[in-house]
Amino acid sequence: MKTLVLPLLILAASAWAAEPQVAEIINEHAPYPECHAATIAEVAPGHLVAAWFGGTREGNPDVCIWVARHEDGRWMEAVNVAGGRQPDGNRYPTWNPVLFQPRSGPLVLFYKVGPAPSQWWGMMVTSPDGGRTWSPPQKLPDGVLGPIKNKSVTLPDGAWLCPSSTEGGPGGWRVHFELTRDAGRTWKIIGPVEAGPNLDAIQPSVLFHRDGRLQALCRTRNGVIATTWSNDGGMHWSALAATTLPNPNSGIDAVTLADGRQLLVYNDSAPPPDQPTKGMRCPLDVALSDDGVAWHHVLTLESKPCPNGYAYPSVIQTADGLVRIVYTWNRQHIKYVVLDPRDLKP
C-alpha cells in the first residue's frame, strides 16, 4: 500500500492545480517581426480590446500602435490605429499603449511618441464604439505623460488616477501619478514619489485595499519590486520601499479582485550579481496577497526559456469574475490567458 501513496498525492495535486481556461496567441500572423507592451480592457460584458506596439524593432520609427477586438469568443485581426508621424514630416516610434474604459464615456487609449523614453510625450485617442473607430490623436499637456505602462484606475469620486513615471534626465527613474477629474482636459501631477534607499523605480500599478488605502507596486532596476502607499486617496504617497518579490528590471501588473485579494503578474526571477540591472524575463508567474505585503506564488504561466522571454503583463478582472492577462511572448507575439481566480490558491 505504501507504494500507492506518492502517485495518489501527485494525482490529487494535479487535480487541484490551477490551469488557464484559455491560453492563445492574439496576433499569430502579424505583419511585423517584433511586438511588445500589451494592454487590455473590457468595454462591455464579454467584449474586450487589446493593444500593443509593433514594428521592425522597439524604438524604430515604423513602430505603431495596434488594436484587436475580442468578440463572440475570438480575437479579430489587429489594426494599426496610431503612429508617430509628425506635421513636419519626421516620424518617431510609438510606445507603451494603455487602454482605459471609464465608468461612462468612450474607451481611451493612451500612448507615447518620441525618439526614446527620456524624450517621449503623452498622446491619447478615444473610441466611442468599443475600439472599432478612433478619434484623431491628441497630445497631452506638457509634462503629462498619461499612464506609463499600467492601467489607470477610477477613484471613488470618479477621478482618473494614472500611474506614471519618468526615465532619464536629472531625476533618473522616478514614479509619479497624474489625476484628472474632467476626462483628460485638465491634469494634476502628484509626486514624484520619494525614491527611498537605493531604489530606482518606474511603471507603478495601483491596488485598492479594504481599509481605504491605495498601494502601488513598481518595477525597479535594483532586483526587487518596490511598493508605495497612500492613505488619502492617492494625493500623497509614502517613500518607496523594497518588497520581498524579485524583479529582473521588467514590467509587472496587478489588480484588486472583487473578493478583496490582490493579484500580481510578474517575472519571478532576480538579476544575476554581475548584471544587477538586467535579468531573465522568465518565468512569468502569478502571485496572490490578502494585504499587499505577504505574497504567495499560485501559478506559473510560462517557464520554458526563450531568447526574449515573457514580459510586460497587463491584467484585469472582467464582469464575469474571470481574470484576463495579455503579455509579450518572446517579442514575436502577444499572448492572452484567462484564469478563474477561485481556482488560485497558495
Model-derived segments and spans:
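Asp-box/BNR beta-propeller blade signature and adjacent active/binding-site loops
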Residues: W16-P346
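Sec-dependent N-terminal signal peptides
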Residues: T3-S14
